[in-house]
Amino acid sequence: MARVTVEDCLEKVDNRFLLVMLSSKRVKQLFKGARPLIDNRGANKNVVVSLREIAAGKIGCEIGKKGR
C-alpha cells in the first residue's frame, strides 16, 4: 500500500469521527513505545502508521457492551 487514504480506512471503520478517535488513540500508544503492527521500513510518522494499521484491518474498535 503506497498511500493510505481516508476512504481506505472507512472501509474498516464506518464513521469518520470514530476513525479520528481510533487513530489518535493508536498514535498515543505508538508515541509511548508500542510496536507498529505493520512493516514500517519507511520510517513513517505515527499518524501514517496508525492509518495504515486501520486500513490493513490490524486494529479496530467495538461499540457497545463488548467494547467497554
Curated annotation (Swiss-Prot):
Biological process terms in GO annotation: DNA-templated transcription
Intrachain S-S bonds: none
InterPro entries membership: DNA-dir_RNA_pol_omega (IPR003716), Pol_omega/Rpo6/RPB6 (IPR006110), RPB6/omega-like_sf (IPR036161)
GO terms assigned for molecular function: DNA binding; DNA-directed RNA polymerase activity
UniProt keyword terms in alphabetical order: DNA-directed RNA polymerase, Nucleotidyltransferase, Transcription, Transferase
Pfam families the record matches: RNA_pol_Rpb6
Catalytic reactions of this protein: RNA(n) + a ribonucleoside 5'-triphosphate = RNA(n+1) + diphosphate
Annotated GO CC locations: DNA-directed RNA polymerase complex
EC number: 2.7.7.6
SUPFAM superfamilies: RPB6/omega subunit-like
EC supergroup of this enzyme: transferase
Function summary: Promotes RNA polymerase assembly. Latches the N- and C-terminal regions of the beta' subunit thereby facilitating its interaction with the beta and alpha subunits.
Assembly information from the UniProt record: The RNAP catalytic core consists of 2 alpha, 1 beta, 1 beta' and 1 omega subunit. When a sigma factor is associated with the core the holoenzyme is formed, which can initiate transcription.
HAMAP family per UniProt: RNApol_bact_RpoZ (MF_00366)
Protein family per UniProt: Belongs to the RNA polymerase subunit omega family.
Descriptive protein name: DNA-directed RNA polymerase subunit omega
Protein source organism: Geobacter sp. (strain M21)
Taxonomic lineage of the native organism: Bacteria, Pseudomonadati, Thermodesulfobacteriota, Desulfuromonadia, Geobacterales
